[in-house]
């Protein structure tokens, strides 16, 4: 990204911390998990450069995106394009994209098989939550649409095929060993398998946030599950920036069988990646300008 005068604004890795976990990923696999990015291509470049430079220490390498690549930030389409080729860039044998609540809103609006009223409701929610920044990247409005129905039609026609195809690859969760990767978390009061089986395309009007893996915050973030963890798993998630607290502690999270990789990229200029090998995890933080700083630099 370029500031006035041609100076390039770069993101860089500014912190590395290593922890021992109460659960482990599969013994033959090293897992690179990347948290919420929200249209910050610069932060993703920094994280992928770091990942590409990591010496392989296991037979297999997997890359997991925890969701919310889109909305709010300056370059959601660029972030998706970068993510599509990220596995090859870091030498991964497998790449997994998880669906965040922002991708859920986007896909519900753009899925032609969705009931029209449900799609319009999803579109309204998506636009209220930063989706307009994405739409402006692939729709050139010579004339403003007459209403939401026309707007939805225009967006569906203009959506690039590669973006639609990427949306359709996203899944609800992924597991390696006794570590569960999911966008928002789980509900400790609900059977784990039943909770994770909730359909992604549940109409937004019917979604109860505490009962959906793309939306849950409470009671998950305040849970202390004990030595059994969450259904036997440690949970790696994003969705709630820094646990909605000013100074979150990964040590405290790990004691409660979870790790939060949402660093609040738009407001903080930070994004996180965790590298899992066995029961060890290395958490890396990339720092760039905030969205507000980028807006001032570009305009």
Please place each PLM-identified region on the residue numbering.
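Residue-level marker for buried hydrophobic side chains located in beta-strands
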Residues: 31-33, 63-65, 97-98, 180, ...
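Active-site environment of divalent metal-dependent phosphoester hydrolases
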Residues: 39-42, 71-74, 102-107, 188, ...
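Binuclear metal-dependent phosphoesterase catalytic core
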Residues: 254, 258-299
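Divalent metal-coordination and catalytic microenvironments
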Residues: 36, 68, 83, 100-101, ...
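Active-site neighborhood of divalent metal-dependent phosphoester bond hydrolases
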Residues: 73-171
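N-terminal active-site segment of His-dependent metallophosphoesterases
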Residues: 2-82
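Acidic, His/Gly-enriched loop-helix segments that form or flank divalent-metal centers
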Residues: 142-259, 264-269
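A general structural motif
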Residues: 28, 58-61, 92-94, 177, ...
